[in-house]
Every structure is written in C-alpha cells, then in structure tokens.
Amino acid sequence: MSPWQPLLLVLLALGYSFAAPHQRQPTYVVFPRDLKTSNLTDTQLAEDYLYRYGYTRAAQMMGEKQSLRPALLMLQKQLSLPQTGELDSETLKAIRSPRCGVPDVGKFQTFDGDLKWHHHNITYWIQSYTEDLPRDVIDDSFARAFAVWSAVTPLTFTRVYGLEADIVIQFGVAEHGDGYPFDGKDGLLAHAFPPGPGIQGDAHFDDDELWSLGKGAVVPTYFGNANGAPCHFPFTFEGRSYLSCTTDGRNDGKPWCGTTADYDTDRKYGFCPSENLYTEHGNGDGKPCVFPFIFEGHSYSACTTKGRSDGYRWCATTANYDQDKADGFCPTRADVTVTGGNSAGEMCVFPFVFLGKQYSTCTSEGRSDGRLWCATTSNFDADKKWGFCPDQGYSLFLVAAHEFGHALGLDHSSVPEALMYPMYHYHEDSPLHEDDIKGIHHLYGRGSKPDPRPPATTAAEPQPTAPPTMCSTAPPMAYPTGGPTVAPTGAPSPGPTGPPTAGPSEAPTESSTPDDNPCNVDVFDAIADIQGALHFFKDGRYWKFSNHGGNQLQGPFLIARTWPAFPSKLNSAFEDPQPKKIFFFLWAQMWVYTGQSVLGPRSLDKLGLGSEVTLVTGLLPRRGGKALLISRERIWKFDLKSQKVDPQSVTRLDNEFSGVPWNSHNVFQYQDKAYFCHDKYFWRVSFHNRVNQVDHVAYVTYDLLQCP
C-alpha cells in the first residue's frame, strides 16, 4: 500500500427507489446518488466491497481461485466476525456499515515504513469549516480529538493559521483537490493521510454529511431562560413532540425550542436562530428582518436569494431596501437544513404542498424507507425541490479522533471496541481502548498524564452557523420578551454579607486531610492571578501556586479568614494590579476589595449588564484601565475605574477567541496568556500579531499545578 493513499472512512450508501402513493399509483422520487448500489445483488455488492478494500487481490496473491470464500474468510477474520466464509447476514451488515476504505492491515499496525512524526509538538490548521455546526463547536471537537491522543503520549497539538501546519484540516465535497473524491451523503465520511510533508498528515471531511455531536442536529439558542443551552430534539410542548424549532405558543413568529426533553415539566427554553431575531453580516447592524420589504420595486415577505449569485438568503432590515440599502443575511438552522435530495444545504420551507396536501413538519410520506424529508419551496408538486431532514448525523469528535489516529501513523485495529476499528459507531464513553493505546505507544511512547478521557462538552455552542469565508457578527442585544408559557426564574442569591471587621489575614487550615491536596480536586470553583500567584478556589478554601524561583504551593487557606465579607464559594475572581483591587463574583453579585475595605455585594445590573446576565465567567485585563468582562458566550468592554460596561461593545466570545469552549466556567489571565477552563481542562490562548490563538489544551492539575 502506498503511504500516499489516504485513509477513507466509508459508509456504503445503499440506494433505493422510493414510492409515494398518488391515486393508488406510486409516485417515485428520484434521489441523487441513491441509485449507486440499488441494482446490485448481495453477491455483486460483496464483490465490489471485497475488491475495493483489498481482500480479493490479497486472496489472488495467495493463489486462491476466483471465489468469494477466501476473501470473505479474510474479511471476517479482520473484522472479528464469525469465520463462515459465507455471505451471511452478519457479514452483509458489516459491509453496509461505515468504515475506512483502505485494505485492513491488522491491529497494532502502522503504515508501511512505520511512518510517524519525528517531533512531538504537532501543529494543525483548520482551513475550512462546515455549516452544520457553530465554528467554536468545530474548534472544540477538533481540540478534544487531539486531546485524546495527547493524554496518552508525549505529543502536544498546537493550532496555527497557515499551510506550514503539520496537519491541515478541511471540509470539502466531491472532488476536493487531492484525487480522492467524496461521494455525497452517506458515502465517504472522511479520509486522512499518513505523517509526512505536504499533503501527508492532512485530514479531510465530507461536507455532504451531517456533522453533529452524534445526537442529531445542533441548534444553539439565544435568550430564553436556558443560558444558551442547545435545543433538545425531540422535546415535548403541550403534550406534542417536536423534532425542530417551532413558533407554536407564540404570536411574534420567533421560533423557539425546549432545551430539555420535556418543556411541559422543566420549562427550559431558548430562541432558535431566526431572521425574526437577528441577521448576520451585511450592513444592518444585526437587526432582524423587516417583512415585507421592497427590493427593486418588488415586495418580499420572506428571505430571498434575489440579487445574489451565491445562493445566500438575505433580507432588508428596513421596510424599503431600495431607499435605505440596509440588509443582512438570514441565519441558517441545522434542524431544518436538508442533506441530499436536489437542494442540499437549503432550508425546509413550512408549510409545503406535496401531492395536494399541506405539511408543516418533515414527513416520510411518499417514501417506503420511512426517512423524513421536506420541500425547500412552498410547493413540491410544482417545484420538485426537496431534501432529507437531519438525522442523528456523525460525531465530528469521534470521526476526527479516528482520523487523527491515522494522521499520527496508526492503521486499523481488529478490536470492535477500539477507536481505530474501521467501522463508525457512536458512543459517549472514553473513545480509547487498550488496543489504541498500545498502538500509539508503539510509535511515540507513553505520556505522563493519567486518565485519557477527553474533556466533555455540552453538545452545542449558542452561535448560529456562519456562511463560509465571512466573519460572524453578534445578534442584537434587545431581548425577546416572554417564553412560550412562563418567564425564567432568577439566579440564586448568596445573601447579604457585612464589611470585614479586620484586615485580611492568611493562615493555613489546621487539619490535614486528603482534601487538603489540590491535586485531588476535579474542578475548581475559580482560578485567578492575584499578586503574581495563581489562586485556586474550592469550597471555601484556596491554594496559592507560583513558579517564580521554582514551583511553590501553599495552602489551603480559608477564604473567610482572608476575605471575611465574602461567601464560601465564588464563580470567578480578578485582580486589577494598579490600585490592587480584587473583584469577586458569585452569580449575579460582585464584591470589590481594596486593602482592608470592601464594596459590595453589588448586583450585576449596576455594572450596566441586563438582568438576564446572572454569571461572570471572568475578566481579562486590557490597557488603559479596561478589561474584557466575559459571561458565558458574550463579552463586554469593562471600565475598571467606573465599574461599568460599554453596552455597545457586546460581542460573541468566538469573535474574539475562536476555539475555546463557550461554556467555560472560569476565565483568567496568567503570565500574558488567557486561560479558559472547562471541566478539568484548560484552553490556553496566546496573543500574537493581534490574533488570539489557542496554543495549548491540557489538564488544570497536571499542567498548571504541576501535580505528579
């Protein structure tokens, strides 16, 4: 096998002709690419498969006659199937499953020549994106996929921005420039090249697939009372199940969704990306569409592609575009963006007419396989424009972790539970199997960090998908009023506390238990740089760590003894080094310590933040007495002297810091680099040539605290 041949993760697309009833006569809907194997018998399908993946050729080289049996035996052995030599149901099922497209070499194997990287700091560049997921979800998925391998090896993975990267990541369709074309929906999922210069080491993903986190379309939410949590599909509202966002229960036309499985019980919701909520790009300052609007003398009551050659949907943000020239692009939503059909990438239009009947949701009518589809115009009967509604999709994280294993030099495993097993299968557990670890140790040796489980993610980041090559803009901060039924509840309050009666003092706690060791802490309440030392806060205590003059760890200390006016827990802390002010945040309240005096608690709305802001994730210092105040996925400029935010400065987190988790629970700056913490991990951001770049993803305890 040539080392230049890519590893192709393949799902054999089985096509069918599907019938729709119409006056007792079936109406056939012809689906592009569905007919690739529709006329093949099981034997013909097996012959094609065995030839494509090298089994037939290998059997011939062993002197076997033209017979399926020897090749089937080899296939069944490689895939750990019962070795019958027959084309039985289990073998056919495997043939129809997602898998890599090169000959299988066996477990613990690497490419011919034992190809590997000969340096340990591997760089990668995300050259292009899919519109199926928000960009920071994609960035996070790739970072977590690399973390799978860095956790068990001495390798580190650094994101860069340019072709000099060792691993270049891109999304493409069909023939995308490397001589190994993708073949549409449910065909080749991805491929990667073995380590080496040029195209070697690169990983490509088929953009005709639906990329998700493995549980269906990812739709972020805004506002509502779910703090930006993604939609949960299906969700129940008034006893009815919904597979996509809906306007039911509202009279303003703004689509919404439940963020748990049962809105009727949990009352958690958010608003879905919609032109009735905001627009992207353009010159309309993110304002929502105004319908109807006038363009070239014609009236439009919905987003349109008129006047554009690129197919992007847009609208005017005033009633008369001809007069005001104010416009924006209409957001897309993964839950109604179709795949396949003859309108891939377009959005379902509801309601639509099919065989004279009106449909307000995706339907399986007219199909014998039960797959859900929709029209992308209001009348399928007239326009014949359609596509498949989103399914569960493929986990970008899992596929990327598999592909990056190939990019590091690993071939396939014959252990079905291994990440490097040829077939795709979704699971939520730690993806690495002992088989994978043995293989990567064979190439690069052991790592120093335990627990190879990668950081978890909460499924989606609350940003809409942006068209490629365009920078995203923030939605307007004028909030919709009211939910489908009830208003959100407020954040918990810690209760008032009095000013300190004495100056801060520091003394370690008297007892010594395993809990006194910060290396035993899974997730800290907050981390902050105070007086040049990192302070790690947890459950009313804190530790100080400094690497000046060697690594020095002190504590634990009692928060109540050092800062008597403060509650025992906090969400974030920040020191303004010039006047030596320390800001503490707990939910919707803030305290400021200056020497021996304290100001607070003050509510966050006194800072100029809206009442919907109930958490400060952290502050990052900037010049001129300013800071960036971060609350989950949003950022404001904050004046440290007046202690006010600039309400016009609000923007999305990914506009400033691409690639960090939107749901970081703590953000701080240390030694001129920003740290975004999620779970037990941190994403480190360096500031280089005015570009904020994630340069390291690692463990808080092992890498920051230097725990053994």
UniProtKB/Swiss-Prot annotation:
Motif (Cysteine switch): 98-105
Compositional bias annotation for Pro residues: 491-502
Hemopexin repeats: 521-566, 567-611, 613-660, 661-707
Residues binding Zn(2+) 1: H176, D178, H191, H204
InterPro entries, A to Z: FN_type2_dom, FN_type2_sf, Hemopexin-like_dom, Hemopexin-like_dom_sf, Hemopexin-like_repeat, Hemopexin_CS, Kringle-like, M10A_MMP
Cofactor note: Binds 2 Zn(2+) ions per subunit.
Positions of the Fibronectin type-II domain: 226-274, 284-332, 343-391
Residues given in the record as Ca(2+) 1 binding sites: D132, D207, E209
Annotated positions binding Ca(2+) 2: D166, G198, Q200, D202
Record note on quaternary structure: Exists as monomer or homodimer; disulfide-linked. Also exists as heterodimer with LCN2. Macrophages and transformed cell lines produce only the monomeric form. Interacts with ECM1.
Gene Ontology process terms (BP): apoptotic process; cell migration; cellular response to cell-matrix adhesion; cellular response to cytokine stimulus; cellular response to interleukin-1; cellular response to iron(III) ion; cellular response to lipopolysaccharide; cellular response to low-density lipoprotein particle stimulus
Stretches for region Disordered: 441-520
Protein name per Swiss-Prot or TrEMBL: Matrix metalloproteinase-9
Domain free text: The conserved cysteine present in the cysteine-switch motif binds the catalytic zinc ion, thus inhibiting the enzyme. The dissociation of the cysteine from the zinc ion upon the activation-peptide release activates the enzyme.
Cellular component annotations (GO), alphabetically ordered: extracellular matrix of synaptic cleft; extracellular space; glutamatergic synapse; postsynaptic density, intracellular component; protein-containing complex; Schaffer collateral - CA1 synapse
Pfam families referenced in this protein's UniProt entry, alphabetically: fn2, Hemopexin, Peptidase_M10, PT
Propeptide stretch(es), residue numbers: 20-107
Gene3D superfamilies membership: Collagenase (Catalytic Domain) (3.40.390.10), Fibronectin, type II, collagen-binding (2.10.10.10), Hemopexin-like domain (2.110.10.10)
Compositionally biased spans, kind Low complexity: 480-490
Names of required cofactors: Zn(2+); Ca(2+)
Residues involved in Ca(2+) 3 binding: D183, G184, D186, L188, D206, E209
Organism: Rattus norvegicus
Source species, domain of life: Eukaryota
Stretch forming the signal peptide: 1-19
One annotated GO molecular function: identical protein binding
Protein family: Belongs to the peptidase M10A family.
Active site: E403
